[in-house]
Design a protein with these regions (language model features):
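Sec-dependent bacterial lipoprotein signal peptides
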Residues: 1-21
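Secreted glycan hydrolases and related glycan-binding modules that recognize and/or cleave
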Residues: 11, 22-247
Length: 247
């Protein structure tokens, strides 16, 4: 009996040690670095002008192509960055204009609309126009007014897309967000700055449910990323777009 009691006690001790060891390892597992964005696992991409098209684009379903910029310098004018009209047959494409100002003059509007028509006439499956602008959260009402003007000028055959900031969901005025969402068809919220994922992006993701419109998340190729479980359950979440980096 005594031997059995000693055996049971020794077994209990081993079990306790095993549990303690498991508990000790858990924080180490939680500290593991997040995953990295693998472009090969996605089918929607940003391709900036001057970036050589990688092989991953062969399986793309959606491609956002930078056409030009409207820069902050005076006067406001369109600066073309793509030397030729693209010819893409296997994927839907968006014509992207990067803008640093909202006071567009008539020549700018005419040039952008003419480029849209040229891209469509070349046989592309052109979804529409994407405006890439870092609108500050406190200025969303002004941006919404600009987007309403863009929607008014765009022929109905073209959709309107915008990029946005994750901070919109945390601090954006509800009325301004609703006005913005009423005129756009596609929103891509950027989770990166430059070539890196924004530090602490997880905190922003927790407030995405406040957004009153569907959205996608823009990820930078090779950047840190770990999707929270709640994201897949958000009815407004429409997937990812990967920003491809120069090779």
């Amino acid at each position: 009996m005594r031997a059995r009691a000693i055996g049971r006690a020794f077994g209990a001790l081993l079990l306790c040690c095993g549990l303690l060891a498991g508990c000790a390892k858990q924080p180490e597992q939680e500290r593991q670095p997040p995953g990295r964005v693998d472009a090969a696992q996605h089918d929607a991409f940003f391709l900036w002008a001057g970036v050589k098209a990688p092989e991953v684009l062969a399986k793309a379903r959606t491609i956002y192509l930078l056409d030009g910029e409207v820069r902050a310098g005076s006067p406001a004018r369109f600066v073309p960055l793509r030397p030729a009209v693209p010819h893409v047959r296997h994927a839907e494409i968006w014509l992207v204009v990067r803008l640093e100002r909202l006071d567009w003059k008539e020549p700018v509007w005419r040039r952008v609309l003419a480029d849209l028509d040229r891209w469509q006439a070349a046989g592309n499956r052109l979804a529409g126009l994407q405006l890439d602008f870092d609108a500050r959260t406190r200025g969303l009402d002004r941006y919404a007014a600009f987007l309403a003007e863009a929607r008014r000028r765009l022929p109905r055959r073209y959709k309107l897309s915008i990029t946005g900031l994750m901070d919109w969901s945390a601090g954006g005025d509800p009325a301004a967000l609703a006005a913005l969402g009423s005129v756009v068809d596609d929103v891509v919220l950027q989770t990166y700055q430059g070539r890196r994922t924004v530090p602490g992006y997880e905190a922003y993701l927790r407030s995405l449910a406040r957004l009153p419109f569907p959205y996608r998340l823009g990820l930078v190729e090779g950047g840190a990323w770990r999707a929270p479980p709640a994201l897949a359950r958000d009815p407004h979440f429409r997937g990812y777009v990967v920003f491809l980096l120069p090779r």
